[in-house]
A protein has these predicted regions:
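Catalytic domains of riboflavin
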Residues: 1-181
Length: 181
């Protein structure tokens, strides 16, 4: 699998960079790159701060998101405790990347999230929202974006337990550390 992934990374790009600009956010100045996915026209966003060398380990967060949740609103004023903590870590290190992989709802994904919501509420978790789950295509999109912004070694910002990511070396990526937030 990893050889196939490596071949596709070199020969089949699924993204086109549509915007590349500096923006001022409530977290400070960041470089925003917007990528359009060639298979479905969804737009994914990479926000970066600082510079890094080609082989340097870089603080990285990859978010599943819905653009209808207004990512730009969150960056300029709306409060989001989780993102506040993530951007605080990036600012403290003075460099890093935060990716937003667009996962606008497809019918089946929405149905499965509703089923999960019912299970959570039966357990008494009435305000907990089922997470968006990334599928393997999303990892490929994220990997192509990381390749474009020259990140190969990742210090992943996550509160989830560490798990082996199948095929990640085929993407030319290496997870060197997990950082809780």
């Amino acid at each position: 699998i990893e050889d196939l992934v490596a071949y596709r990374m070199q020969h089949d790009s699924l993204i086109l960079k549509r915007q590349d600009t500096e923006i001022e956010t409530k977290f400070g100045k960041y470089r925003l790159r917007a990528y359009q996915q060639t298979t479905n026209n969804q737009v994914h966003i990479a926000l970066t701060k600082g510079e890094w060398k080609d082989n340097e380990s870089v603080l990285t967060r990859i978010n599943s998101s819905q653009m209808s949740n207004d990512i730009l609103g969150i960056l300029t004023g709306f409060s989001n405790n989780s993102l506040d903590k993530i951007f605080s870590l990036v600012n403290k290190e003075k460099k890093g990347a935060v990716l937003f992989i667009n996962q606008e709802q497809h019918s089946e994904n929405l149905i499965s999230r509703i089923v999960e919501l019912k299970k959570l509420q039966k357990k008494g978790n009435i305000s907990k929202i089922p997470p968006l789950k990334m599928d393997l295509k999303d990892y490929g999109i994220g990997a192509q974006i990381l390749h474009d912004i020259r990140i190969k070694k990742l210090k992943i910002i996550s509160n989830n337990k560490q798990s082996r990511r199948v095929g990640i070396t085929g993407y030319g990526l290496e997870i060197v550390e997990y950082i809780n937030y």
